[in-house]
């Protein structure tokens, strides 16, 4: 009975939605968009796409859905519909917005494929392509190519050089050095990546087990020490080295994210999107 009622309710709901005027729904979508309710606007545009079988409103609806999805942060949907718009309308702006949606999704591999296929026909378009391509190259770790691309823009060479000096500094830190430091003196491997609290904790823990090991073999003999304390000491000693390596990778990722965001702040404002 409950299942039958649910199905009945679904049919009533669908029927009432399909009876609603398409033009009225578009008006609701546009009103929602104008007042900044982008999620609601996207919902109305989706409804029009679903129920309008004539296709008369496709161009308007797809564009509205693409923009409202982008502005609401639903970049997966905006990428899809900006791509659709590139086939429906002339102009490079929609292709560029598709690429920006992919970047917002952190889908940098597909974004790079799209930006390499992007063929602008004016100087502004070429600059847009160079900015986005350089940002993508940086995020993907191709720092030499990214720097080469940014230098072509001739925007802020001093700040750019500062960013890439920081890149070189971070890249000099290696997992092997973090492990060796931790092996020689517990805690220094963590401090190497500026995780000082973790380094102190590692030093205290391993020192405690080391002291317990010495105390045990002194009072109860080598065999008892090896059996009871040594496995724990080795576990935390080796664990400290592994932790130092992992924390270094985490530190480097954080540093590169910060540097990437600095580049975005510097260059993203130079992107100009034209839909004429």
Give the ranges of each region predicted by the language model.
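Bacterial Sec-dependent N-terminal signal peptides
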Residues: 1-26
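Residue-level marker of positions within ordered structural domains that often coincide
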Residues: 6, 17, 34, 212, ...
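General structural signal for secondary-structure boundaries
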Residues: 18, 121, 155-157, 173-175, ...
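Alpha-helical protein-protein interaction scaffolds
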Residues: 22-169
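Hydrophobic alpha-helical membrane segments
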Residues: 60, 74, 91-100, 107, ...
């Amino acid at each position: 009975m409950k299942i039958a009622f649910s199905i009945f309710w679904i049919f009533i709901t669908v029927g009432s939605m399909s009876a609603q005027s398409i033009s009225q729904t578009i008006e609701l979508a546009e009103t929602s968009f104008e007042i900044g309710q982008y999620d609601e606007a996207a919902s109305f545009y989706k409804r029009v796409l679903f129920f309008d079988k004539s296709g008369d409103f496709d161009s308007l609806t797809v564009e509205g859905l693409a923009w409202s999805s982008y502005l609401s942060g639903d970049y997966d949907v905006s990428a899809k519909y900006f791509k659709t718009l590139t086939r429906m309308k002339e102009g490079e702006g929609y292709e560029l917005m598709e690429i920006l949606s992919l970047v917002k999704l952190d889908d940098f591999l597909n974004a790079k494929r799209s930006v390499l296929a992007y063929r602008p026909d004016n100087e502004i378009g070429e600059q847009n392509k160079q900015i986005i391509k350089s940002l993508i190259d940086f995020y993907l770790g191709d720092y030499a190519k990214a720097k080469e691309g940014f230098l072509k823009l001739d925007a802020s060479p001093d700040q750019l050089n500062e960013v890439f000096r920081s890149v070189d500094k971070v890249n000099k830190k290696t997992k092997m050095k973090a492990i060796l430091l931790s092996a020689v003196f517990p805690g220094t491997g963590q401090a190497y990546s500026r995780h000082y609290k973790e380094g102190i904790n590692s030093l205290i823990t391993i020192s405690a087990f080391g002291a317990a090991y010495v105390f045990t073999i002194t009072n109860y003999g080598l065999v008892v020490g090896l059996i009871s304390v040594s496995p724990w000491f080795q576990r935390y000693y080796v664990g400290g080295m592994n932790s130092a390596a992992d924390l270094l990778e985490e530190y480097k990722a954080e540093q590169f994210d910060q540097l990437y965001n600095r580049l975005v702040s510097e260059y993203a404002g130079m992107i100009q999107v034209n839909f004429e």
